[in-house]
Amino acid sequence: LKESKEPVIVISHQPIAGIYTIDNAVEIQNLLSVHASKIILAINGHAHVDQLIQVAGVTYLHLTSASYYWVGEKHAHLSMDADTHANYPSLTSTCPYAAVLFGILTLDRKQGKLTLTGRKSSWIGPSPLELGYSILSKEEQGLYLQPQISDRAIA
């Protein structure tokens, strides 16, 4: 980043800011914030949430999973037919989406705009909130834990 003359998009699997951050998130945020003017976006996916936040001048985007949210064995349930669950036993620990999710990022460097065109789906079976999944608060689940990738305009 120090030597880059071009704008940069930082891509990581696990979150650097927001929900479910890596252990040394603050250290990485501090390193990135020094170069905030060069960073268009920092993007990650691991948390399976739909969240956009700013920390110290850097915009961080969480992209949700393409197909499900993991709730674990404690919240195991049947969301599909018995044959599907027999073939894919791990499905009982997920809240799957009815349609695959994806987003399209478009960068317009002349106008200095980045847009994300997302996609919405629905839960197959109960949502994590309906199952009593408790790592996130009810408010956070309502805001960030949805079967969707939101449309966004990032300047």
For each feature predicted by the language model, list its residue ranges.
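His/acidic metal-ligating clusters that form di-metal
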Residues: 1-59
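Binuclear metal-dependent phosphoesterase catalytic core
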Residues: 51-155
